[in-house]
C-alpha cells in the first residue's frame, strides 16, 4: 500500500462509475430482497448491539465499563471488513498512525512502525534508533522489538483492542502513547470445530494474489483441547522496475538496469502456523502454551518514484505510473517464531497470572543503495574517491547486504483481587530482555583493496554490532468504590532500563581517519568485524503514575477523568562525541465518556485530551549517514476521539470512528544540547552552534506541526443484511479518510519531501452465507485512489531528497473468498 501525487493516467471503464451509483449499489439491496424467502417481520426491529468483553485492564470487563479511550474490532467486524494484515485494521482505528518498514534494510513489508495519538517526531534514521512509542501485544505477550512490531496475519482472531493514551502503568515501556492488543481465539474443550477459507484477488494493473487459511479445534477430553491455525498467501505486486540508465558526473560512467527490469516486482509469499494447547488442571488452574511461526519472502520496493515519466530523470514518458528505476537486488527473507506460556489460577479468592514469552526473528535482506552514490557524486564530486586496484575510477553505486537477528524474552507475574469487592487491586512484576544483532555490508563492486573495510572485499562500510535493552518493573493499581457509582483508581510503575551497544561500524582505515577501523580500541573480531570501536552502556531508574475518577451515571452511561504518564526508555548514541539520550515522558490529561442509548441500539463513546511530551527523542541521519538521537524539546497534542455504533434497523448497522489532533512543538528545536544536557531552545539567526557553525534559526520553530499524524482521521462503515434463498446476504460499504501529513519535523527536510496528501479510500463488499459456508466478493480501494501513506529517500533528505519514494495505497483490488466451517 502506498502514496504520492495523483498523476494523470488512462481512463479505465470502472472509474467511470459515478460515486452516487456506487453508493446506491451498495445500499440498495431491494433487487435481491424482492426475491428473498421472507421479509423482516415486525419483531425483528428489536435488534440491539452485542456486548463486547475486553481485557484491556488485565481482567475481563464490559467495554462500556472501562474508563479508557478504547476501540475494539471484534471477530465479526474483522471478518466483515476483510481484515488480513496491519494496514487493513490500521485505517479503521482513528488513533493509530503508522510508517512502513521492511525487515533489515528492505523497504517492503515486514515490521510495523505504529504511532498513537500523534506522538511521533518523524525521522530518517535507521537501526540503533529510539524504541517505538506505542506497543503491540499478541494475547499477553509483547511483540514490539527495537525496530518495530510483528505484522501478524489476521485469521482466527478474537478481537483487536486499541488502547489510546499512556498505558505504562499496567503495560511495558513502549506503551508510552498507547497499546494495540491482538487477541487470538483459544482452544475450546467443549467441542470439535474447524474451518477453512480460500481467497483469490486481482490488483488493477498488477498481479494475482491468493490466500489459503484454516483452523481446527480438537478436544482431547473435558479438560483439554488443541487449536491449530495455518495460512499460506501470495501478495501480488503492482510496482514495476522499469528500464533506465544513470550517468555519474565525475567519472562519466553509465550504468544500465536491463537485467533487473520486472513487472509487478514487489510481491511477497508468506506461510505460517499457530498452535495452542489449553489444559485445565482443575477448576482453578489452567495452562496454555502457544507457538506461532511465520516465514515471508518478499521482493521489490514498495516505494514509487514520483518522477516516473519525467525525461529529466531518465524515464520514458510512457512509463507505468507505479514504477521505479532500481539497479540492484531488493529482497527480504524473514523468519520468526514466538513461544509463550500462560498460567492462570487462583490463590484463595485472588487471580494469579504468569506469562512467559520468547521470540526469535532472523531477517536476511538486500537493498538498492545506488541513489546514495549518485547524489553524493552530483553534489560534492564524491565519485572521485571510488577506484579499483589499478587506480581507475569505478561505478560508485552501493548496494546493501544485511542480516538482522532479534531476540526477546519476557516474564510477567501479576495478581488481581476479586472484581466484585469495593476495594480492588492489580499488582505485578515484569522483566524483559531484547537484543538486536546487526550485520550490514555496504558494497561497491571492484573497490580497491586499500580502501575497503579491512578483511571485507568490495565493502566500503560495515556495521557489525549487538544492541541489548533490558527492562525491569514493579507495577500496581488500586481501585476503591467511593460510592456505588463513583470509583477512584491510582496506579504506579517503578522501572529500571539498561541499554548497551557493542561492535564495529564504519570504513576501513585506508578510506577514513575519523570513522571506522581508525577508531578501534580493541582487536576483538566482534561478529566478524575487523575490530571493536564501540562498547557503551547506560541505565535509568524512574517511575510513572496514573489517577482515574469514574462516575457511573447509570447502567448505560459513564464519564471519567484521567491523569496518566507514559515513558519510552533512553539509550546511547553510536557516535562517541554524543551523550546518551534519556527517557522521554508523556503526560496525559483526559476526559472521556461511554454511553449507550435507545435500548442499546446506539453506542457513543469519546475522549477529549491534552498530552504534554517532554524532551522527546528525535532520531535522524547525521554525518556519514550515522544515526543520531537527541532529546529534542517539548510538544503538545490536543485531541478529540469519537467512536460510534448504531443498529439503525434490524437489517442496517453503522459503525464509525473519528479523531482530531492538534500536535505541535511548544519550543524551538535547535538541534543541540546545553551544557547541562537539556535541549537548546533559543537559537535566532546568527547563533553559533557548539561546532562553530552559524545557524540561520531553529531547525523547527515553536508551533511547528508534528509529522506522521493527520489533523483528522475517520472511518464510516454501513452493512445491510437481508434474507435470501434460505441464507443471509449482505451489502457493505466502508469509507476511510485521512488528512494531509508532514513527513519530517525539521523545516528544511519537510520542504524537500512536501506534504503527504489527504485521501479517502472506499471498500465495497457483498456476500451470502447459508448454514456453515459463505461466499464473499470484495472491492478494496474501489475508486483506485492514490492514497499517500509514506515518503522516504535512500539517504538523508537534504542529499537524496530530490529522488524520494512515495508509498501508495494498494490499487483497486477485486477479490473472491469462499469459507466453510464444520
Across the structure, where does each feature detected by a protein language model lie?
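N-terminal Sec signal peptide and the immediately downstream disordered periplasmic leader
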Residues: 1-93, 217, 283, 287, ...
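C-terminal beta-signal and adjacent terminal beta-strands/loops
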Residues: 2-4, 725, 736-748, 767-822
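N-terminal periplasmic accessory domains that precede
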Residues: 86, 112-115, 162, 175-198, ...
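Short acidic/polar hinge/loop motifs at secondary-structure boundaries
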Residues: 126-127, 133-164, 214
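Transmembrane beta-barrel wall of Gram-negative outer-membrane proteins
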Residues: 204-301, 405-411, 415-432, 466-479, ...
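Membrane-embedded beta-barrel scaffold of Gram-negative outer-membrane proteins
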Residues: 213, 340-370, 552-568, 582-647, ...
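Solvent-exposed loop segments that connect transmembrane elements
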Residues: 238-264, 299-327, 368-401, 441-464, ...
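Gram-negative outer-membrane beta-barrel transporters
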Residues: 488, 610, 631-745, 817-821
